[in-house]
Design a protein with these regions (language model features):
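Conserved beta-strand and immediately adjacent loop positions that scaffold enzyme active sites
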Residues: 7, 32, 100
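A generic fold-level signal
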Residues: 1-3, 11, 27-28, 74-77, ...
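Unchanged
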Residues: 39-64, 69-122, 139
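Conserved N-terminal beta-strand and adjoining loop/helix that marks the start
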Residues: 1-18, 36
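Acidic/histidine-enriched, glycine/proline-rich intrinsically disordered or flexible terminal extensions
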Residues: 131-136
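Conserved Nudix-box catalytic region and its N-terminal flanking loop in Nudix hydrolases
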Residues: 15-56
């Protein structure tokens, strides 16, 4: 079964927004830091999906459409990565899905785990984020 997802790399003041995923065994990388976004609904474009997911997960709509950055293929999974600016302070976001959200620096991204203020513990970065982190560190 082919599966497509669309994820958002959102930057604000030199830091990137991450989501601490729920601790649910039914999801990919439970309890790991990842990007906001999710699956494509039937007949939905990747761009439509990433914008819908941002509303559903953090109640935020970008002022301008996010830019398609790259697409990766891993077996039956196609991941569309979008990039753009987070135009509001993180405190203005409403976390509706996941355990925490955080703006992270390049230094934190290199460490492999990130501290969660809400959970009061460090949690690992999702292994699937490797490609995104490598590209961010090159920029």
């Amino acid at each position: 079964m082919k599966r497509e997802v669309a994820l958002a790399v959102l930057e604000r003041n030199g830091a990137w927004l991450l989501q601490l995923r729920d601790d649910l065994e039914s999801i990919l990388y439970p309890g790991h830091w990842g990007l906001f976004g999710g699956h494509l609904d039937p007949d939905e474009t990747p761009s439509e999906a990433v914008h819908r997911e941002l509303l559903e997960e953090i109640n935020w709509k970008p002022a301008f459409p996010l830019e398609h950055w790259f697409t990766s293929q891993n077996g039956p999974r196609t991941t569309h990565i979008f990039r753009g600016a987070l135009s509001v302070p993180v405190e203005q976001l409403t976390l509706l899905e996941g355990q925490d959200l955080k703006l992270t620096s390049k230094y934190e991204l290199r460490q492999g785990s990130i501290w969660s203020d809400r959970r009061s513990e460090a949690r690992p970065i999702a292994p699937g984020l490797d490609q995104v982190i490598k590209r961010l560190l090159i920029d």
